[in-house]
C-alpha cells in the first residue's frame, strides 16, 4: 500500500488551498466539501456557517434555561422559550377588573387560574378576551352552577365567558382554558368550584368568540362591572 504525504493539496486552477493537513492529523478544506456516499464522524464537529440537510438549512439553538425548548414564530429566528409560559400572579383584592396583557401572537392556548377569588357582590364573573383592546360583545357563552343551597342554574352572556357565581362570599378555585379554534376564533371551557360556609358550589364555563385580530390580552371582571375583587389570586399560563 502506498502512502501519499503532503501538507497542501491544490487544484491547478484553484486560487485557494483545497486541502491542508497538519502534523496532528487535522484536515482543513478550503471551500465546499461534497460527500457522495455515507460519512461517519466519531469526533466533535463545529459548524460556523449554515448546515443544510436534505435541502433545508439546519439551525442549532441551545436552550438557556432548564425546561425550555428552541422556538420560532417565523421559521427563521429561534430562541430559547419555556414550553408553557407562566404569567405574573395578581392579587384579586381590589378593583373591578384584572388584566393580563402582552400575550404573544403565536399563542394557541391560555389557561386562566383562580385561587380563592372573591368579589364584593353576587354578580357573575366574566372572562373577556381582546386584540389591542378588550372585546365586550359577540360572545356565545353559557355558565352553569350546581349549588348546594339553590340547586342548578344556567346563565348566558354575550359580553364574555360567564362564571355563574351568583352567591355571596364565593371563594372560587379552578381554571378556565381558552383554545384557539381557527383564525382569531377562540373557544372556552372550564370547571371551577368553591365552598361557601356549609355549601359546596361547582361551576362550568363554555363558549366562543371571534376577535378582530390576534389575542393579546385577557380580562377578568363581573357582569355588572361594579363589584370589586376582595380576595384571592389570579394568574394565566399560555402556550
What annotation goes with each model-predicted range?
Residues 1-80:
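Intrinsic low-complexity, repeat-rich intrinsically disordered segments enriched
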Residues 12, 18-20, 26, 68, ...:
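Surface-exposed molecular-recognition determinants
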Amino acid at each position: 500500500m502506498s502512502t501519499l504525504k503532503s501538507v497542501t493539496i491544490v487544484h491547478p486552477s484553484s486560487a485557494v488551498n483545497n486541502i491542508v493537513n497538519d502534523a496532528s492529523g487535522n484536515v482543513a478544506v478550503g471551500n465546499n466539501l461534497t460527500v457522495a456516499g455515507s460519512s461517519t464522524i466519531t469526533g466533535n464537529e463545529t459548524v460556523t456557517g449554515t448546515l443544510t440537510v436534505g435541502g433545508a438549512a439546519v439551525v442549532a439553538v441551545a436552550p438557556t434555561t432548564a425546561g425550555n425548548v428552541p422556538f420560532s414564530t417565523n421559521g427563521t429566528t429561534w430562541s430559547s422559550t419555556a414550553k408553557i409560559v407562566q404569567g405574573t400572579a395578581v392579587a384579586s383584592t381590589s378593583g373591578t377588573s384584572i388584566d393580563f396583557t402582552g400575550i404573544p401572537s403565536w399563542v394557541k392556548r391560555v389557561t386562566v387560574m383562580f385561587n380563592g377569588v372573591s368579589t364584593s357582590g353576587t354578580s357573575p364573573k366574566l372572562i373577556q378576551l381582546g386584540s389591542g383592546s378588550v372585546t365586550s360583545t359577540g360572545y356565545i357563552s353559557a355558565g352553569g352552577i350546581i349549588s348546594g343551597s339553590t340547586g342548578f342554574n344556567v346563565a348566558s352572556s354575550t359580553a364574555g365567558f360567564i362564571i355563574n357565581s351568583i352567591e355571596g362570599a364565593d371563594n372560587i378555585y379552578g381554571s378556565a382554558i381558552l383554545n384557539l379554534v381557527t383564525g382569531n376564533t377562540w373557544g372556552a371551557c372550564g370547571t371551577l368550584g368553591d365552598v361557601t360556609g356549609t355549601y359546596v358550589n361547582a361551576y362550568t364555563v363554555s363558549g366562543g368568540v371571534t376577535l378582530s385580530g390576534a389575542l393579546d390580552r385577557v380580562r377578568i371582571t363581573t357582569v355588572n362591572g361594579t363589584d370589586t375583587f376582595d380576595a384571592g389570586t389570579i394568574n394565566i399560563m399560555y402556550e
